[in-house]
Amino acid sequence: TIYTPSNYIMPSRMQKYMDLYSNKGSSNNLSQSGREQGIRRLMSINLLKRLESSVYSFNLTLTRIKDLINQTIDMINSYKSGSKVMDMVDYSDASDFDEDDQNTDFFSVGKKVKIDLADMDYITWLHELEQDAENLELLSLMIADITPEHDIKLQTLFDLLRDKMANPINLGNKKVIIFTAFSDTADYLYANVSQFMKQNYGLDTAEITGTVDGKTTIRNLRSDLNTVLTCFSPVSKGKAMLMPNNPAEIDVLIAT
């Protein structure tokens, strides 16, 4: 319900927001309501995508939703009789969605919406927000014990890496590329895989995503895309000519 505040606008106040949305470029209130419903559906699907990606990524999004709900609950609880305008700009943060979802119309139109709590059935909304908060807290508690040591997907990846090291497709080929849709998962994988590969095989790892600077376990090595790729694929990138005095080589690349 955190993503559908328009559902709680009182019927007697609906015309006010129909006119307001019309002034912002929408033909009627249904466009804003439809956008909210779309974002809610996308977030439901997105939570499943992030859970499939990694429990770490899932938990981050879950925490952000919980924080948003709790902030809104606090705002409603502090509401008195005066005019309190609720700014809805941040209720559809696209950063938790993958690139395909971010390109939908839900994130390109009608973002700046303000709703006066005096125009809402905020008592019902508050009750449903509290129910959502309770359910999400229970879900958080259920996944809290899934540490990297108990993360079956991560441990399965370690097994695959062990097999790759023991049985390379080409003799001496230790190169591994791991792709993921979410930068949060890339961070999680880098933190765990880099340590695993360094401790067990003495191999270096790098991470490249589109949202942050790259990372690498090689000290004093620039972590920009070109440098990382040159060290990961030294023959094809001509590393001997570009970096003749640097013997560093990256064997594991984690990327989005």
Language model feature labels by segment:
Residues T1-S223, M243-A255:
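Helicase motor interdomain insertion/brace
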Residues L225-L229:
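Long, amphipathic, Lys/Arg-enriched alpha-helical "connector/arm" segment
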Residues T230, P234-M243:
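AAA+ P-loop NTPase catalytic core and its hallmark functional loops
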